[in-house]
Amino acid sequence: MTEELHSIDGTFVDLSAHIKLRVAGNDRLRFLNGQITADIRKAGASNSIQACLLDAKGRLTAHASILAAPDYFLLDADPELKETLQSRLERYIIADDVSVEDVSKLWSIFHLIGKTAPASPDARWVVSARRFARPGWDIWVDALHREKMLEQLSAGSSFCDSNCAEVLRIEEGIPRWERELTNEIIPIEANLEESCIDYDKGCYVGQEVISRMKMSGQRNKKLCGLISTEHTSLTPGMRLLATPAKDKEAGWITSACHSARLSKEIALGFVKRGFNSPGTKLVAAASPDQAGEIQVEVADLPFIH
């Protein structure tokens, strides 16, 4: 299936390129709970959680999904984190009985969107997960059986390739590493508060900053939807300018695509406080190698409810 996806339920994506880490040892629960923004005790073998890892200033170092097996936890994250996620965890292992192992080559992951769990006898785990801000299922299978599982899923579901998955991600307002999520972003700014942050779980790296932001109720910028009112394509990296004078920079675009379901050119971007209310009109300034300006309107996320 191409990016022109019209029906979402019963659609599946291949996440096998994700980095996958196994965290084991007697201190694994206590250790991970001190590293992530979510409560690791809520992860199970039939349901996963989403969590962020932060630095001491509350800025993102990773975003991951986590499931709990009887003797270890499994984390998976965008492939762009392959070189940094394991070292980020190991940096904080002092006298803990904890090991972190890269098991990316051992497992393949598929995600099926829909409320009904798939019948997957060859799967090691079928885990409830909200990858696209809606009910779905992660299917973990031995990497040797990846092609077999792909065939089984394709027999009854629609495959969403990488282009299709990117459009769906943008339509649903889901941030991705190296696009919306970087080492300069605080998770609340990227709308990850509801899905990733537990304010009652106890201490973790970066907690003080997150707690202060919650108490103040303010964030300097916010991840927003943007719609081209001229039906002209938008481009990641475009600057957003306040109208009508265009003398104030209001933010920047991080991801963009054409949405066939909306018949519109849409984008995700960070918009500064004072300019991020839905309906606000802004100008997207062309990248240095392009010419022209595009009128855009701030929109609620997700684009499609």
What do these predicted regions represent?
Residues 13-34, 101-115, 218-229:
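Short glycine-/aliphatic-rich beta-strand segments at the starts of folded cytosolic domains
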Residues 185, 191-197, 204-207, 211-305:
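Glycine-rich, small/acidic residue-mixed loop/short-helix segments
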Residues 1-8, 51-63, 93-96, 119-127, ...:
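Short amphipathic beta-strand starts and helix->beta connectors
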Residues 25, 75, 112-114, 139, ...:
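Residue-level signal for inorganic ion chemistry
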Residues 1-63, 67-70:
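Acidic, proline/glycine-enriched N-terminal capping motif
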Residues 140-227:
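Anionic-ligand-binding alpha/beta catalytic cores of soluble enzymes and soluble regulatory domains
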Residues 11-13, 20, 65-176:
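Acidic, low-complexity central loop/insert segments
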Residues 33-41, 83, 87-95, 155, ...:
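Short, intrinsically disordered, mixed-charge
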